[in-house]
């Protein structure tokens, strides 16, 4: 069941899934991409806008040590027939 436009939902994104699959120095950039893909899949969104607070949390400990999981708040909006998900820290 997709999220209705205007509805807020809390997700816990499991970043640990990709940590061992990529080189250490690529972990934070790959984690940011993974968050975008994961939210797009679970919120059924065409576009995902990640807030600066989420990006700073991913990069907080450097490129090699992103957090294992991330608790985020997702708000889905609909404009011009596209579903846009805005992601911020919960």
Curated annotation (Swiss-Prot):
InterPro entries: Ribosomal_eL31, Ribosomal_eL31_CS, Ribosomal_eL31_dom_sf. Keywords: Ribonucleoprotein, Ribosomal protein. SMART domains: Ribosomal_L31e (SM01380). The keyword Ribonucleoprotein applies. Pfam families: Ribosomal_L31e (PF01198). One of its GO terms (biological process) is cytoplasmic translation. GO terms for cellular component: cytosolic large ribosomal subunit. GO terms for molecular function: structural constituent of ribosome. Belongs to the eukaryotic ribosomal protein eL31 family. Part of the 50S ribosomal subunit. This is Large ribosomal subunit protein eL31. It comes from Thermococcus kodakarensis (strain ATCC BAA-918 / JCM 12380 / KOD1). The gene is rpl31e.
């Amino acid at each position: 069941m997709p999220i209705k436009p205007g509805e807020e939902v809390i997700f816990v994104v499991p970043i640990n899934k990709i940590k061992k699959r990529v080189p250490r120095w690529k972990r934070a950039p790959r984690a940011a991409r993974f968050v975008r893909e994961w939210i797009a899949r679970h919120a059924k969104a065409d576009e995902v806008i990640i807030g600066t607070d989420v990006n700073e949390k991913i990069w907080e400990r450097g490129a090699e040590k992103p957090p294992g999981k991330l608790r985020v708040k997702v708000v889905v909006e609909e404009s011009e027939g596209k579903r846009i998900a805005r992601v911020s820290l919960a």
